[in-house]
Amino acid sequence: IVGGDECNINEHRFLVALYDPDGFFC
């Protein structure tokens, strides 16, 4: 999950960073 409206959600960004640091590009 990279880019798009999803990156505008802080909680989502945080969860993505924890789940897949290598895929955290927001």
Curated annotation (Swiss-Prot):
Keywords: Blood coagulation cascade activating toxin, Fibrinogenolytic toxin, Hemostasis impairing toxin, Hydrolase, Protease, Secreted, Serine protease, Toxin
GO molecular function term, any single one: toxin activity
Enzyme Commission identifier(s): 3.4.21.-
Compartments, as annotated in UniProt: Secreted
Primary location: secreted
A single BP term in Gene Ontology: proteolysis
Gene Ontology CC annotation, any one: extracellular region
Tissue spec. comment: Expressed by the venom gland.
Known role: Thrombin-like snake venom serine protease that cleaves alpha-chain of fibrinogen (FGA) releases only fibrinopeptide A. Shows coagulant, esterase and amidase activities.
Annotated family: Belongs to the peptidase S1 family. Snake venom subfamily.
Name of the protein in its database record: Thrombin-like enzyme LmrSP-3
